[in-house]
Amino acid sequence: METKRVLSSSGSIDSISPLPDELLSHILSFLPTKRAASTSILSKRWRTLFPLMNHLCASLYLDDTDLLYPERQTEEEYYVIHNSFRNFVDKTLSGCNNNSLKKFSLTYEDDDVQRMCLTTGMMSKALEQGVSDLELYIYMPLMYEPPRLLPDTVFINNTLVKLTLGTELCLGRSPWENLEELYIHHIYIEDRDEEFNIHTAPHYIAHNIKKLTVCYNNDVQAPRILSIYTPNLVYLDYSDYLTCLYNSENHFNDLLEARLDLAFARAGRWGDEHDTCLKIMNSITNVQILHLSCFTVENLATLHFEGSEKEYWQLLCNMIEKSPKLETLVLEGLYGISDCEVGIDGGNMVKVVEIQEYKGRLEELNQVKCFLREMENLEEVKVNTSDEIENKLQLTNDLLALLPKRSSKCNIHVL
């Protein structure tokens, strides 16, 4: 169908005006909401298109960083601009068609915690529209006190399936009824108890959650304890200190993919986090995809590593790279590995390698070769063999042939 072209008052060809209102509203929906609203000043017709967009559109993205005049000149102008933004959000939500809005995203900055009640009002209006996907990012750069709690309606809403909470938002103590996806980014966790105590920590039960993301960028001045019971979790993305994650009831039996970016407090500042780490790793034994990263483990001197899967040994290389003071490495489970290339970037200071339950198979020898050629500071290699090994002298000669030139004086003990 050929589009009719209209000459504008300036003489140029206008291909927009002939389009139907519904199509123009759809085009507006691709603009940031505030920009779309600014088209209302173009003409009398355009004044009706933005409300129509809200009536038809299934998603709203409201961000005060997209204000038409974002420069903060004076304190008075700052409050005028942000009050205007809140009024704009309120009117925009009021113009939405009931049950048509599926996603609501709100991002803004405020220095007054007392106005949190206005924020909860915005959330309530969005939830009244039947929103299933709610995103909230509130920034309070000048506030030094905990923000107010989110309303219980956020957690017990019947339509909400996906919830994203970011910065300066405070979780209450309400359960999540129907959530399937939860994303937590640098939120404040309510804990009225002055003493750091796992038994009095906020406890959340979320039977339906399939995806959980917790991200704090390891930015914390005091310990946080968050206990979330998620028995049906299939995806976990966690980046923080370990005080926030582990619940003894969580075994993650259905977990298929996990991304762990773990941080450890200095000198056990908040308890034995390494024990917690071990519990977590033992609880994700059924995981199929594992992404593991952490900061440098500055003082780790001895590492005992056991694994019978190729992916585990690739993980070991990462552990060695992040342990600059590692001197003793104990390996077990080499018999389950074949064709696993080992590469350790940045060098290492490993002086002692101990291999347990060595069975003398070809794949084991190849795997030992991969590791030993990366150890240029080796002083001693201990091999604890199984009863299947008869010719220990030949084994010793084989291992000597694998050593890099810089470790040619290394002592080898076959036990």
UniProtKB/Swiss-Prot annotation:
Domain F-box: 13-59
Disulfide bonds: none
Superkingdom per UniProt: Eukaryota
Secretion signal span: none
PANTHER family: (RAPE) HYPOTHETICAL PROTEIN, RNI-LIKE SUPERFAMILY PROTEIN
Protein name: Putative F-box protein At5g40050
